[in-house]
């Protein structure tokens, strides 16, 4: 069983938190981690590029000039790709699918590898509770300063906490996620992982069925 000292916000006794060894002490596997991260990045990708083909551009309803007798090359439509303003041949379309499907056990193992690496690098902070009585961004910034959090931070919550979510919404590089939805990509991209004690239990119950 892995142990981690609870990070205190106020002056009170610091406790040792027992962390599941099979979640927070998994050996590093670079290939597996890369596979899961690339898959999740691809699944979040938004397809923007969409070139217009000859069937999408304006004009071309009439033959530009007659077939013979002009001395010029024959043309059938102004929408031809060889004309300025014509359609694009073999251009990118928004019908492309980048989604990559991985087995659940692979995604789960990737998450455990990512959490374990954060644990080994002391980039995981466990706190007793992060519940806020009111929506206050300034108060949340002060709390993060007390916890000595620098850079990007992922706050893992055991359940939806609207006060906390709204308080962190305008803080740069700080994001929140429910423990049941935690994933490898979000863990890897954050510098520090801040987990509520109850959040650890939710992670164990969700991913170690």
Give the location of each predicted region:
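Extended polybasic, low-complexity segments that bind anionic RNA or targeting/receptor surfaces
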Residues: 1-46, 93-209
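A polyanion-binding, active-site-adjacent surface
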Residues: 39, 43-56, 60-63, 75, ...
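Glycine/serine-rich anion-binding loops at beta->alpha junctions
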Residues: 54-91
């Amino acid at each position: 069983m892995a142990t981690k000292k609870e990070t205190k916000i106020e002056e009170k006794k610091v406790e040792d938190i027992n962390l599941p060894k099979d979640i927070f002490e998994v050996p590093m596997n670079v290939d597996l981690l890369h596979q899961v991260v690339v898959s999740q990045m691809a699944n979040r990708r938004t397809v923007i590029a969409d070139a217009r083909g000859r069937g999408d551009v304006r004009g071309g309803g009439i033959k530009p000039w007659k077939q013979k007798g002009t001395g010029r090359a024959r043309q059938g439509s102004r929408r031809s790709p060889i004309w300025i303003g014509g359609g694009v041949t073999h251009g990118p379309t928004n019908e492309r699918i980048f989604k990559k499907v991985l087995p659940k056990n692979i995604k789960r193992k990737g998450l455990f590898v990512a959490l374990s690496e954060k644990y080994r690098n002391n980039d995981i902070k466990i706190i007793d509770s992060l519940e806020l009585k009111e929506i206050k961004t300034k108060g949340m910034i002060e709390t993060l300063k007390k916890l000595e959090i620098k850079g990007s931070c992922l706050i893992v919550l055991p359940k939806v906490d609207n006060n906390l979510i709204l308080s962190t919404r305008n803080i740069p590089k700080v994001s929140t996620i429910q423990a049941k939805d935690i994933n490898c990509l979000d863990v890897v991209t954050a510098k520090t992982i801040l987990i509520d004690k109850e959040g650890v239990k939710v992670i164990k119950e969700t991913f170690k069925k």
